[in-house]
């Protein structure tokens, strides 16, 4: 197994154990045992559990979110179509990291001592600035903030639903786009214009 594949395998197993047992109750020793490797082999890639979690966020959430932000900043001034595409791309980003986003919400207390929470907050606030107008009314600012929250929260608030994850992601995206469309026009929520699935350039 190559170094890159070993690192990814460690991340995958760690995330599974964190979800199953909780972050605080999972040790590096248990992760190594689950992988069938020595602690020394694990330490080669990650010296601490915090390093491991940080790598997960950097690879699966922070990096992709930065790519969305970079795309948005390159497409200024922000039109409604650009705002909707920002949501489209960010929805795909979250969809590709569903287990990690769920972990983030379920382990907020444990993550508070790490820099991850603050880094994620920074990205979300940056995205919020990109999808709302500077002179937006307070109600429209709330709509834009609610759009981002909707995409995050739907992943775990509808766990009892029979819909598959992709259907829930698309439904949350549709609602988020309706909210941002309403905020852009300064009116009550209405259907968002048609947009394709996430298009990466």
What role is predicted for each listed range?
Residues 71-75, 108, 158-162:
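Secondary-structure edge/capping motif, primarily at the C-terminal ends of alpha-helices
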Residues 104-110:
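Short linear capping/connector segments at secondary-structure termini
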Residues 9, 13, 17-51, 55:
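Helix-turn-helix
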Residues 55, 66-100:
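Hydrophobic alpha-helical connector segments
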Residues 101-102, 113-201:
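Hydrophobic/aromatic-rich alpha-helical bundle segments in the mid-to-C-terminal region
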């Amino acid at each position: 197994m190559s170094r890159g594949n070993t690192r990814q395998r460690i991340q995958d197993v760690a995330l599974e154990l964190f979800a199953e047992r909780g972050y605080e109750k999972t040790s590096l020793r248990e992760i190594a045992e689950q992988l069938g490797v020595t602690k020394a082999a694990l330490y080669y890639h990650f010296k601490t559990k915090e390093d491991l979690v940080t790598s997960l966020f950097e690879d699966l959430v922070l990096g992709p979110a930065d790519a969305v932000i970079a795309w948005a900043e390159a497409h200024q001034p922000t039109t409604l179509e650009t705002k909707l595409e920002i949501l489209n791309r960010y929805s795909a980003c979250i969809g590709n990291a569903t287990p990690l986003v769920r972990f983030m919400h379920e382990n907020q207390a444990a993550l508070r001592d790490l820099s991850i929470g603050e880094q994620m907050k920074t990205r979300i606030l940056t995205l919020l600035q990109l999808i709302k107008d500077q002179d937006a009314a307070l109600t429209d600012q709330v709509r834009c903030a609610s759009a981002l929250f909707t995409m995050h929260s739907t992943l775990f608030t509808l766990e009892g639903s029979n819909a598959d994850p992709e259907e829930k992601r698309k439904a949350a995206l549709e609602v988020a786009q309706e909210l941002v469309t309403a905020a852009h026009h300064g009116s009550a929520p209405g259907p968002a214009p048609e947009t394709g699935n996430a298009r990466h350039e």
